[in-house]
């Protein structure tokens, strides 16, 4: 820092000696080495100060502050100094004499000192800038836009005018710094068309970027986050720049980029691993509260247990020095880490109580969600939060805020609502988006469940409110005529309200807007259909048709989302073979560009539909790939880590059973044994009923085995064995008749044979009870994972009987005799 400061001063001295002095006063400013010297000059020469002097003095004061570490800056002292106030008055009096560059520079520098937006100088500079807007060059325009953002004028007519100028001059922009700055400033007032033009322009300029300037692509990614637009080609280019600069990034920059990626649901394993290594490397350098907070936020969710414990210890020692913003960041990270450090949770909760009144509604919502998730044991904090949240809700007129506050209030212990809150919710319902309505539905349902029976008036009000909410939801869905708007609103719905109340209306709208399905929205549309668990052939056929025709326009990583509803819902479209082949051929050349976990998910989804591309399978079951996968999973949350490992096991099992020619070894024995050890061994009342009926059908309870684990660790509800004459065989020797993987061998024809367990000609029968999860919402069609399980059991030599819950609970099977007859026909079928 000292060397830089000396160089800065020396460069000014050298510059001074090179030219013949034409402005002695300016020369005196140039040799100033501190704020005090600047203020002395200003005080002695107020009458002589020109626009140039004023602008230079203000800029110099900011440069002195920039040289200092954040913790040592004295912005408040400078702002309150009498000579700084004099500079502001002089600047305001000389605005008409400023050129465009000086005007914008003075506005920018004066805002560094945290002046209020209503400050007279700031207002006059902004007004003059508005008058000159059309003649600003792009550099001045971008800096002026940054100043407006800092004054919270993102959505102002003035910002809209800047966006219009950018729209007209975009072809002339050749500087990524200027473009990225403008993109971040004007994002809130641009059309989809201008958004696409900005993205295309950024895409072309990133290729020409000096890779050391990582702040420019960071702002581009920030723009994409602000627009909620995951445009992967541009994200990957920006990520490439970040990868080349990770070694130079500090925790703050890494934390920002990681947060942006999370918001965009963009994963890059290489960046996460490099970022984690860099953050661990900088741990010892982060000794102050500000840097350690950023380190904790970035590294905590990706760190192993030892590093986490060290980070938590550091936070405990610094917590008392943290400001409200830092405490909020720490709490959010603790939630993401699934922190169970009760001492740290209690400490942060206690400190938060001092600042609750200073937080904005959205921040209070985050605090409430976090302390509920972390199971905070501080009743005083919950009580204070409830009072503040209720007060804010009653005074708010913004639908999004009311719905958000209602949702978080409903999560508080023993939450109660009064008539004023219900009245407020009732008033804003017609203005709510689908995501707002879903939040309110979640809150109202919770209030109904916790409402005391004696409060009948409130209970009735809640019921009527829920009915009105459902009506508003149906009306809003019916009015939407743009599929992209429809998908955007549905993306942020929470809870079961949509699936339980509005599902048919939603699917009807999908059918109504089906002609608007294009390659641009196919992946998002497919993900939504998967989420609904609703098999609509018309919609799925359209997705398959558009994807097949325009597969080259869809980003290769989006093929997973595009395929998902077909494999999950077990639906084969009319052009099924062409559709699957087009998707497979599209992503195969890019396998090395996929994150490891996505390759596993993609391979598993194809396995559900009986597609096993050899290149994909060999890529997964490769020592180097599995090593990269393990490294990536270490940076994931425990839930996502477990999900990917489960899918890898299921893929390994599917390949071993269905594609023995690939000669992929089975290496999940220990993993499956651990899963089996943790599993809940209880059975449901329906399963208990079926077991008793099987005893009557087969001749005794010892003829049917419950909760059987097969080779390759498929869990089946019941197993029985029939001899070659279809006579039941009792389980006399459990050790002999239980399936044993060591006795399983490949037969000549491919299927697995168990060589020593069964008498000649005997047949194992697997009996499975399929509850509603095994079917789509509107169909008796069995979903993909249950179809795959049946295939595997048949390969293992089982005759598989799948009992559908809707059949078992139907009117036709409402008596014991009917159930017995149903089971007997299925078990002793002719094809057994």
From Swiss-Prot:
UniProt KW keywords: Mitochondrion, Transit peptide
Localisation: Mitochondrion
Record-level GO cellular component terms: mitochondrion
Single GO biological process annotation from the record: regulation of mitochondrial mRNA stability
Alphabetized Pfam families for the sequence: FAST_1, FAST_2, RAP
Domain (RAP) ranges: 765-825
Taxonomy, superkingdom: Eukaryota
InterPro entries, alphabetized: FAST_2, FAST_kinase, FAST_Leu-rich, RAP
PANTHER family: FAST KINASE DOMAIN-CONTAINING PROTEIN 1, MITOCHONDRIAL (PTHR21228:SF29), FAST LEU-RICH DOMAIN-CONTAINING (PTHR21228)
Membership in a protein family: Belongs to the FAST kinase family.
Domain notes: The RAP domain seems to regulate mitochondrial mRNA levels.
Function description: May regulate the stability of some mitochondrial mRNA species.
UniProt-recorded name of the protein: FAST kinase domain-containing protein 1, mitochondrial
Organism: Xenopus tropicalis
Gene behind the chain: fastkd1
